[in-house]
């Protein structure tokens, strides 16, 4: 007998049924929530009350517990409690319960946000509020619906659009036109005007194929280019007879029986990318003596490693395509007249280890000029004028439009958006970190944050960039859609409200095929396993021993380790609240057994100069206070930020020699470049479970996870690691080798650059032959930028030389 199909009950019906069957118990629970008064409750608070009330009889209330475990927050406005329920990643429902009347109702996104706004303004529900909704523009656009498709946008897009575009022979004409449009600075590539039809193309390809099989495979393409021009085929098919034949054969197969995999492979072989612009305006962007400066950390390292790998891949592909073209990559950042001992005041700087990559610095232009560093939170009033100046400088340097513009972080992504819009080129977005995730409730309680951080500008810029861009690169799945228990960075922008400014009812779709996971790696010339003894930089060992163990206290290192035979707990990060270096020190200080097992060495901040960053100043004070409170002298070494990456690589390996571990204790880490660096050196790594490291590390196999919000448990995990490693040294080796295996499989710059090149080709193609430009969305964004962002940016105070800048 066939199984009977039953209707899925709505969330309201399920909750209503639970209230009907257990009214007294649920009244008691929701009354506990209401008795806490007006405000917000987080998931752990909701579950704590449930556990306290039903600890002895949980099974009975399992269906309701499932709902509660999916709740991410609750808004309490007595007698109402509203819940934001996330049954699975990227999917949200909203309900509201009246505790007095036992009434349950479902809410729309707009209704839930309006209810939430009453936390800060009891009259909010009566006001007309601008609502931002991008969903109508994407209603007819293809999107996957399974969570396994997150971050695999290009594969999905190829499958969907291939079937649509290649329905019949006539549908292939856009591909023909795309190939004919290929040129570089006026020089035609791939096809010339001799080919006017698909039949003509196929005929030319077959004639070319017949010729190619008659000559040696290693014949240089330069020997038959002239013959091929007469057929209608220009340069760009390959550098040898074999490679040209492979490319032509691939296209013939596509024309006969199109399929998405062949299309992606073909687009990866034809010349499409010669000039790339990478934007990273804020901070001190240079190749040396800057790491550890305010707003200057992993993003700088990421970009410098990225361009080296990308240039190598571009040169390789250009050679294999049989072209004589010199590529160009420009990293565009702010020129700082007050360069404080760095090269940040130099307009053009060659990137070491490259042939065709430069750092191009463009100053922020104001009426009176501005010389000093400006916090990344204060850059918004300068960016529109900056974009105009950058556009002029790019044309001066490149003499042509770039093929790809890559934005980094919120400011770089906004400038990339304005440039891509102006020049009509493909745009790639890399967030690194979306601040809305790092500062919980910074949207609803905007008034508490905005004067210091100007999040109204930043969140607006983020929305504009993520909806304008052609494709988004993330380092991890978590960036897009989080995990079962935590909300992803981009996912947090689906719906939120900025009271008195606007309400976002649909800000981004995490199922959008523009999302692609492309994970970076570490520079393997700098970071390599400690076991590769012939490559070890032993010349640095005396300096490293001085750094770690000398009895001298100075501006580079504070406090002295009394027992150098212990393994080292090592951590290196910026000194800010989210990186949680002070939290690591407190966790260590509170656990006497951990202090007995290992020394603590942290690299953070700069003892030699007074920070201009207010958050860093506060962390400095807290660090000294904790060291005093927990009597850590003799157990801790606090080292100033280290600028020498090459020596830092050997420092990781030296910590391996002590059988130590690297700990990354951040409250949230978007990716975790230091995690990758440490693992690449073979140093066992124990890192936060919030953000990218949760994905990089397979817990117990390639490292360990800790939760910085539960520091006592985190300390116990460290204790257990060192106890097991002492009792059985093979355990330390197992975690070390597991980390290296994970790196080689997933996190290398070679894999990254290959994927980025392919993505650029595929998205560029689909943008040309379809409505992937999303013109309607871009018109909407133009209005939002002009009418909302500009006024918000204008309200941010301009910096004045001589005054402190920082947050």
From Swiss-Prot:
Summary of subunit composition and partner proteins: Forms homotetramers. In endosperm it forms both homotetramers and heterotetramers with SS2, all three possible heterotetramers are formed.
Coiled-coil features, chain-numbered ranges: none
Chain segments annotated as transmembrane: none
Tissue-by-tissue expression: Highly expressed in developing endosperm and in roots and, at lower levels, in coleoptiles and aleurone. In 3 day old roots it is detected in cap cells and along the vascular strand, starting just after the meristemic region. In 9 day old leaves it is found in the phloem. In seeds it is distributed throughout the endosperm and also found in the assimilate-unloading tissues, the nucellar projection, the vascular area and at a high concentration in the chalazal region.
Broad EC category: transferase
Family: Belongs to the glycosyltransferase 1 family. Plant sucrose synthase subfamily.
Function summary: Sucrose-cleaving enzyme that provides UDP-glucose and fructose for various metabolic pathways.
InterPro entries: Glyco_trans_1, Sucrose_synth_GT-B1, Sucrose_synthase_pln/cyn, SUS_EPBD, SUS_N
Name of protein: Sucrose synthase 1
Keyword DNA damage: no
Enzyme Commission number(s): 2.4.1.13
Keyword terms of this UniProt record: Glycosyltransferase, Transferase
Substrates-to-products reaction catalysed: an NDP-alpha-D-glucose + D-fructose = a ribonucleoside 5'-diphosphate + sucrose + H(+)
Species for this entry: Hordeum vulgare
A GO biological-process term: sucrose metabolic process
GO terms of molecular function: sucrose synthase activity
Region of interest (GT-B glycosyltransferase), residue spans: 272-748
Pfam families associated with the record: Glycos_transf_1, GT-B_Sucrose_synth, SUS_EPBD, SUS_N
